[in-house]
Amino acid sequence: MKALVKAKREEGIWMQHDVPVPEVGVHDVMIRVTKSAICGTDVHIYNWDEWSQKTVPVPMVVGHEYVGRVEKVGAEVEAFRPGERVSGEGHVTCGFCRNCRAGRRHLCRHTVGVGVNRPGSFAEYVVIPADNVYRIPDDIPDDIAAIFDPFGNATHTALSFDLVGEDVLVTGAGPIGVMAAAIARHVGARHVVVTDVNDYRLDLARRMGASRAVNVAKEDLRAVMSELGMREGFDVGLEMSGNGRAFRQLLEVMNHGGKVALLGIMAGPEPIDWSQVVFKGLQLKGVYGREMYETWYKMVAMLQSGLDLTAVVTHRFSIDDFQQGFDVMRSGRSGKVVLDWGAAR
């Protein structure tokens, strides 16, 4: 089959046409991929950075954001049938550790990542356990279904705390950050402010519904807060940037008793002023992946109740033009990039 493969321990990803079709175990589902999306993780793997070198075995079929149709099911699978439109949870869990057995599978210490530690979805076919397959309702378009993985990250982070009537700061205007901003507005936040230094992505945040999108290299965040009539500080902070300076600024402008969810991953150890956390009585929560499968139910429900993510998909290419997709993702001038397998030559 055709697939995008991390075939060498160097920068790049390569199209190969002779990749073996993955085998279907008795509890597995084979999915014929129709659309894939490029994740920031895929860019890290493309760049072959330090994390990728330590994490990804080579060769590896990459990719974990996709939508497709069931092609084949294992002998013990009864919940799905060929032809159904589905996506899949990208974290494959052990099912036996304490967290898995308690229903907290997103905290499994033995998690294996699709497209990172096992063959992924930048391929004509991907095989995952039936427990990881999620059926997509007919009223959700393919482009949005293909980005359920990062949409799930945004949902899990944004809904970590009650947002109704709250003032929310989102640090980082990447695709997950701007989706989190849209979610916050959808569920009833008062002011949603997004910060970054990338004007392209700040404009995307505005189109996704942010009250204000602030380039902190050019604007004073506290002045923006005053302009919005905020007298104390932000009630909820969503750290999506993985940037230490942005996180420190977030702590400075949080209200006493505020709550902070962190999804962004710092490149290394970062100093912070712990007195901001202690004396303000802040709550900090680390977020990983998606709650299985409460996050997925909430994603569908929000889309069906009017949440509009259309603007976050900014570029579309045939899978044969995947290099253009990676180039635009690496430029920083894009939202989500979707690759169409149906348009392949």
Curated annotation (Swiss-Prot):
Binds 2 Zn(2+) ions per subunit. Pfam families: ADH_N, ADH_zinc_N. NAD(+) binds at I176, D196, R201, L263, G264, I265, V287, Y288. Its cofactor is Zn(2+). One of its GO terms (biological process) is L-threonine catabolic process to glycine. Homotetramer. This is L-threonine 3-dehydrogenase. It comes from Anaeromyxobacter dehalogenans (strain 2CP-1 / ATCC BAA-258).
